[in-house]
Regions:
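Short helix-adjacent coil turns
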Residues: 76-88
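C-terminal-biased regions
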Residues: 4-15, 29-73, 89-209
């Protein structure tokens, strides 16, 4: 099991990679919406809940994923299992449409950034987190519109204080009970999550509320 507490203890010095110091923690600095061109899933979930009481569908069956999504998921897992974070680089989008790794969207070197997020400094911890997330259940959000996304883990789409005991067991595979209590204070799941669009684009790997 990977512990968020270890990731939270990581604070790196300011570098030329981002405008601010790179830190791994549960919360993300609040930024203006215009600074974040990729809509975050929580915003869409809250908007949906205003008009319907229906929760997003939760799935475990990988075969139900569209072929491009299933392929990208497997590519991320395979790259992470190599133990070399550089193998993720071809999957992280292009300079014109990069995978979002930070809410402020100011990451200049994604591989170095991922290494700095990782407690070991080589990206191994971060890759293990990716594998754990992609082996969990997923949610299908915003079906049929331009922001449609498949997101791991599905906890992002559910009220964090309403999880069943079996769901909590799943949650504790990627974080601790102490982390859960902190998230209850925030009111939402705030650990890492991965989003892949229906066409197989790796849209984001971010953390925060």
């Amino acid at each position: 099991m990977l512990y968020l507490a270890e990731a939270q203890s990581l604070t790196t010095a300011s570098t030329d990679l981002t405008d601010d110091s790179v830190k791994v923690h549960t919360e993300i600095p609040k930024v203006e919406e215009k600074a974040n061109p990729i809509p975050l899933p929580e915003k869409n979930i809250k908007q949906t809940e205003k008009t319907t009481d229906t929760l997003p569908s939760i799935e475990y069956d990988i075969e139900k994923l569209p072929a491009p999504v299933k392929m990208m998921r497997q590519k991320i897992i395979d790259a992470a299992k190599t133990g070399d974070v550089n193998n993720l680089k071809p999957l992280l989008g292009t300079s014109g449409d990069p995978t979002q790794l930070s809410v402020s969207d100011n990451v200049k070197d994604p591989i170095t950034y991922l290494k700095q997020l990782s407690g070991d400094g080589d990206g191994l911890e971060i890759m293990a987190i990716m594998i754990d997330l992609l082996n969990s259940g997923y949610a299908h959000l915003d079906q049929g519109d331009d922001e449609e996304i498949y997101i791991w883990p599905y906890f992002v789409a559910l009220p964090i204080d309403k999880l069943s005991k079996p769901q909590l067991v799943e949650l504790f595979q990627i974080m601790t009970a102490g982390d859960l209590e902190e998230m209850k204070e925030i009111g939402t799941y705030s650990f890492f999550r991965i989003g892949i669009t229906p066409d197989g684009t790796w849209r984001f790997f971010i953390t925060g509320d």
